[in-house]
Amino acid sequence: MAGKLRKSHIPGVSIWQLVEEIPEGCSTPDFEQKPVTSALPEGKNAVFRAVVCGEPRPEVRWQNSKGDLSDSSKYKISSSPGSKEHVLQINKLTGEDTDLYRCTAVNAYGEAACSVRLTVIEVGFRKNRKRHREPQEDLRKELMDFRKLLKKRAPPAPKKKMDLEQIWQLLMTADRKDYEKICLKYGIVDYRGMLRRLQEMKKEQEDKMAQYINTISSLRHIRVTKDGNAKFDLELDLKDSQSKIYLYKDGEMIPYGFNNQTKHCLRRLGKRYEFQIQDLRPEDSGIYQVKVEDAVVFSTELEASAIPPRVVVPLAETHCEEQGDAVFECTLSSPCPSAAWHFRHRLLHPSDKYEVYVSPDGLTHRLVVRGARFSDMGPYSLGTGLYTSSAWLVVEAGKDKDLQSTSADHKLQSRRSGKDGRLDIYGERRDATRSSTSRYKPGTGSFSKDAQGPMGHFSQGLADMEVQPGEAATLSCTLTSDLGPGTWFKDGVKLTTQDGVIFKQDGLVHSLFITHVQGTQAGRYTFVAGDQQSEATLTVQDSPTIAPDVTEKLREPLVVKAGKPVIVKIPFQSHLPIQAAWRKDGAEVVGSSDREAQVDLGDGYTRLCLPSAGRKDCGQYSVTLRSEGGSVQAELTLQVIDKPDPPQGPMEVQDCHRAGVCLRWRPPRDNGGRTVECYVVERRQAGRSTWLKVGEAPADSTTFTDAHVEPGRKYTFRVRAVTSEGAGEALESEEILVAPEALPKAPSAPAILSASSQGITLTWTAPRGPGSAHILGYLIERRKKGSNTWTAVNDQPVPERRWTVADVRQGCQYEFRVTAVAPSGPGEPGPPSDAVFARDPMRPPGLVRNLQVTDRSNTSITLSWAGPDTQEGDEAQGYVVELCSSDSLQWLPCHVGTVPVTTYTAKGLRPGEGYFVRVTAVNEGGQSQPSALDTLVQAMPVTVCPKFLVDSSTKDLLTVKVGDTVRVPVSFEAMPMPEVTWLKDGLPLPKRSVTVTKDGLTQLLIPVAGLSDSGLYTVVLRTLQGKEVAHSFRIRVAACPQAPGPIHLQENVPGTVTAEWEPSPDEAQDVPLHYAVFTRSSAHGPWHEAADRIHTNRFTLLGILPGHEYHFRVVAKNELGASKPSDTSQPWCIPRQRDRFTVKAPCYREPDLSQKPRFLVGLRSHLLPQGCECCMSCAVQGSPRPHVTWFKNDRSLEGNPAVYSTDLLGVCSLTIPSVSPKDSGEYKAVAENTLGQAVSTATLIVIEPST
C-alpha cells in the first residue's frame, strides 16, 4: 500500500491518504473515539467501541494478530444504522483471547487504523496452562539474547588522571562562578587555601606573561556549535608579532593548521585568535591550553558531556511481513537521554504500537514496530540533535490473503558496506541491493545472508544520482531472469506515467527516465519485481538563486555617508535550507552587539545591517548562500564617505625672519572617500581665543607661508583639509615665537694697553653669534670709578677694535665699555674694563721688609711681611708669593694674580718637605726685587710643649653615686702629640676603665662606678724627648647614707623634749653626712622640718604644749642624697591638768537613725581599650554602716588578686589596674546591713586593639 501519512487529532490513530487530491466535501476516515485498552477476568465479555467519521462513510473492520474474527459465536461485530459507532464484543473470555486488536476504517480516499490491547486475567489451574505463543516466545528469546550481547560490552574506559598543575591553570582563567564546580570535580576541598594560592599564581603568571604580551582580554571558554565543532577564542596584543603560539591538550602539545582541513585549526582576525576543534569525538575531551612561548595565557576545558553523541552502529534497513513486528537498532558513542525516534519526520512516542528500549549503558537504542502494515512503510530515524541515522522499513505482503499469524521474525538486516541504500553517519548516500531473504542469526553477533532461492535476482541494482534542475535523469537496473514488468515507487508511492516519468524495459534491463528533473522529483526510488527490489536516491542539486536584476544592482558601489545606517537585503530562491555567510575583504562578518554588524537570515532573503557606518566599514563585501544543492555568491562594494582626517603631523613651523612663518605638513591619512580640494590655514595669537583665516593652500601643496606676522609675538597655526563633504578636523601646531631681527651680541671687556696723563689706549674683541656678522662699528663709553653715569667717547661708530681716549683728566680713575653697532641697530653694551688711572706710569716698588714664618703645619706655611719703603709714585699695589722646593730650581707662584695684604698661607704642601720662600711687591710700574728667607722652611707643625688646659671650673674632687657612669674629659695642648698615660693611685687603670685620646682631648670612662673605683687618678703627658707633665684629681664613689638608729625622747627641761638617736652606720666613713629632724602633731598629718644640717645625734624641741602629741623623724643626708627615715614608735605627749567642774547634761530622747542601705550615686558603665586602668565608684548610705560586696557576672570578687576595692566613708571603689578582654562583663555592688540590702550594676566593655 502506498500513500501519504496524515496526523489525527486523537493520539494513537494513523491515517493513510491513498490519493493525491480529495474532492471538496469528501474526507479520509478518522476516529472520533478510539477503543479503550481493557483487562478483564476470564469468563467475562469484552466490549470495544469505536466512533468513526469520514465521507463517504467508511467501512470498519476488526482484526487481531491471528487474522479475521469470523467466529460469530465468539466475536460479535455490530453497528447501528445511521450511527457512527461500531462495536466488537468478545464472549466468554479465555486466556487465548489476550491479544492486540486492530480497528481499521477504510473508504475510497484513505484508511484510518488504531490498536487496543485486551488482557485476560486467568485464575486457578489455567494460569499454568501452556498456550501457543511461538511468535511471542521467539521475540522474547531474541530480546534476551540481545540483552546478553549488550552485557558483554567492554568495560568503560578508565577516567583520565589530570595533572594538578593543569587544574590550577584552568582555575586561573575560569570564571569565579565556576570555581566551586571545578573544585568539586577535581577534589579540591580547601576553598580558602585555593583562593590564596590562586592569587599568588596569578601574580606569577602576570609577571611571566608581561615578557611577551601587552594585554589579554575577551577570554571566551570552549563551547560546542551546532555543526558539531568546538571553539574558543581570546584577544592578544603581542609585544613581538613573531612570538610563537602553542596549543596543548592535557599537557601535550598538539599541532594545528590554519584551515578547516585539519582537526585543530587557528583563525586569526587582528588581535583575536580563535581555535577550532573539528569533528568532535569523545577522546577530544580534556583541558586545552594556549601558550605564548613558555607562558600559559589561557586554559579551558572541554567536558565529555558537552560532546554530542555520534552514531557508531547506524540503523539498518528492515523487512517484515504485514502484521509482523519490525526491529530497528542503533548504537551511539555516548549516552543521549534526549535521543528521539521519528517516522517520516513525525515524533514517535512509546505506545502499544511503538516500543522503545534503551540498554543499561545508554548507548544502544531499539525501536520495535508492532503489527506492521503497509502504512508503516517508510523511513525511520533516530536523532540526537546533531546527528541522525535513518533506515527504511519495507512491509511485504503475507503468503496468504487471510492475515495469517506471522512469526515475529523481525530479525535485524545486515548492513552491507557501501550497498545498504541509506544515509550513513556522514550523510553520504550509498547504493544497495537488498534481498528479502537476509536474516539475522541470534547469538552470533554478526550478519549473514541465506542462500538464494531458485528465483532471479538483481545483477546490477539502482545507483544513486545527483543532477541539476532541468537536466535528464535515468535510473536503471538489471535482473538475472525475467520476473515480470515490475513496479516503480517514489518514497513508497507507486509511480505512473502521469507523474512525468517514462518507464522502459529492454530485456532484463528496467529503466526510469525523467526528461527535465524538477526539485520536487528528488527522493527515494524503488523498483520491485517479484520478491526482489532495488532502491536508489535521486538528488536534485537545487542550488539557491539570486535574481539577475539584484546582481546587476550589486555591481554598482553602494555609497553612504558616515553615521548613517546601512541595510543590504538580498532576496534569493531556494527549496532547501540555506546557510548565509557574509564576508568583508575575505574576513567573516560576525556581529555581537547593537553597534556592530548584524547578519539576518529570513525566509527568502539575507540581510546585512550596519547601525552606524564608518570609514572602517568600507570594503568589498560578499555573501555566500549555501545549501545541500549547491551555493551561490554575490558581491558588492561599500563606500562610506566622510569628512577627511586631519593632515598628518607634526606640523613643521619655521621662522623665515623677513619672509614670515613657513608651515609644512603631510596629506591626511584618510580623505573620507573624496578628493582633497584645498587646505585652510588659520592662526591665533597667544592670549586670544579667536582663530583668523590667513589663506588657503592648493590640494597638491602641503606648504604655506604667512608673511603677515609681527616680530616678537607668539602664534599658533592650524590646518584643515577641505573636500566636497566639508572641512575635516584640524592639525594644530605648537606655539611659536616670531623673533625680531637679531641684534649683535656684546663685545668683550676692553683691555688697557697703556695709560698716561695724556690718554688711555683700549682694545677689544668682536662679538659672536646671531646679528654679529655685519658689524658697522663700535661705540665707546666711559665713567669715573664709583659713578653710575656712562658718557659717550665718540659720536660715530669706530670701525677698528682699538682706540685711544684722549679726553681724560689727570689723576682720575676711569672704566670703559664698548657697544657693537649693526644694520639692525646697536646691541647690548659689553662688560666694563678694569679701573685705570689717567696718569704717567709708576716706578717699580722697593723690597719687601721683615719677611718671616708665623705658622706651620704638615701641609701649609703661613708668612707675613711688611711693605716696602715708599716714595711718591712707587707704592706697592700687591704682592706675589713664590715657593721653590728643596729638590727643584724653579720658583712657582702660590696663587693667581696678586695678594693685596701682607700675609699669606701657602697650602697643599707635601708633609715634611723643605721649601724656599720669596715675596715680590708689584704695582703698575712693574715688580720689585724679590725678598727671600735665607733658611729652608719645612712643612711641619711648630713644636709646642705639653700643657694641660685647666681653668677655674676644673674640680679636683668628683663625687659619684654607685652604679652611675663616670666620664672625665681632660684637655691639653702639645705638638707633636705626646704619649698619654692614665694612673689610679699610682698604678695602671683596671681593665673595666676605658680611656680615649684624640685631638688634644683625653677622656676617662667608667661604665658602672663601684666603691672600688674611688681613688686618685693621674694623667701623664710624655713627649718624645722624655719630658712629662701630670694632672691629678680624686674620684669618690659613695652611696646614699643608711638610716639612723632608733630615736629616744626625754624631757630634760620642762616645756622641752630632747630627741637622741643612734648614728648612721655610714658616719664612720669618709663621706661627710648630717641629719635632718622632722615633726608632726598627728598620725596622719604632714611632716614639718624642725632642723637641718645637724652634725650631732641630739636635737631639743622647745615650746611643747601639754595635751599635744609629737611625732619625730630623723633622716641622714650627704651630697648624694638622703637615707630612709627613722621614726619614733610612740608619740611624745605631756598630760594636760584640767580643773574639775560639774556639767549637768539636759535630758532628751535620741532619735532612731537606723536606715537600710541605699545608693546615693550608682555605678556607671565603662568602655575602655585594652591595657587601661578601670575604676568603678559608687556612694552608699545606711545605718548601721552597710558592708559592700563586689560581684562580676554574679560571682564574688573577694580574694581576687587581679582587683582591689576600697570603702572610704561610704564611697566604695573597685579598681582593675590593667583591663583585658576577659574582664568584660556585668559588675554589681551589693550593700548589706541588718535592715536590708541595695544593689547597683554596671557593664564593662574592653575593646581589643585592631591588628
Curated annotation (Swiss-Prot):
Polar residues compositional bias, start-end: 434-449
Subcellular compartments: Nucleus; Cytoplasm, Myofibril, Sarcomere, Z line
Keywords from the UniProt entry: Coiled coil, Cytoplasm, Immunoglobulin domain, Nucleus, Repeat
Gene3D superfamilies recorded: Immunoglobulins
Main subcellular localisation: nucleus
Residue ranges, compositional bias (Basic and acidic residues): 403-433
Region of interest (Disordered), ranges: 61-81, 403-454
Tissue: Expressed in skeletal muscle.
InterPro entries: FN3_dom, FN3_sf, Ig-like_dom, Ig-like_dom_sf, Ig-like_fold, Ig_I-set, Ig_sub, Ig_sub2
Domain of life: Eukaryota
CDD domains: FN3 (cd00063)
Residue stretches in coiled coil: 188-221
PANTHER family tied to this protein: IMMUNOGLOBULIN-LIKE AND FIBRONECTIN TYPE III DOMAIN-CONTAINING PROTEIN 1 (PTHR13817:SF138), TITIN (PTHR13817)
Name recorded for this polypeptide: Immunoglobulin-like and fibronectin type III domain-containing protein 1
Gene name linked to the record: IGFN1
